[in-house]
């Protein structure tokens, strides 16, 4: 029977180091996070960094070739981020919900676009 006062079940070991989203574009890569709020901040993104943002639109497209992977809070398999990442062969995890809260510039992560997960390897 449901007990509203029962303690929440313990999370699996390491669960706090995994961010789940939707598979946007297949591929696995490890790299350093660059959290960006606007394409106007795009000059901060260094080649090979993991682009983390809330969502993307056509204004973000010039940044994608520099990114090793893309992670967004909002979106699905037909979102701008997913489509552009697939076209360029860049792994993407979209629709994570809280990636921009949990990830900071300098964090080291592993992005698995095929499984839709981001593993936090080392926090900055």
PLM regions and their residue ranges:
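Non-catalytic, soluble scaffold/interaction modules
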Residues: 1-124
């Amino acid at each position: 029977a449901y007990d509203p006062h029962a303690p929440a079940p313990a999370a699996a070991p390491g669960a706090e180091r995994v961010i789940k989203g939707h598979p946007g574009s297949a591929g696995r890569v490890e790299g350093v996070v660059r959290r960006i709020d606007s394409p106007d901040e795009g000059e901060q993104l260094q080649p090979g960094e993991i682009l983390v943002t809330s969502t993307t639109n056509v204004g973000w497209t010039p940044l994608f070739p520099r990114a090793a992977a893309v992670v967004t809070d909002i979106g699905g398999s037909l979102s701008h981020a997913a489509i552009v990442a697939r076209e360029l062969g860049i792994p993407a995890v979209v629709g994570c919900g809280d990636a921009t809260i949990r990830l900071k510039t300098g964090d080291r992560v592993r992005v698995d676009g095929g499984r839709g997960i981001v593993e936090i390897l080392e926090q900055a």
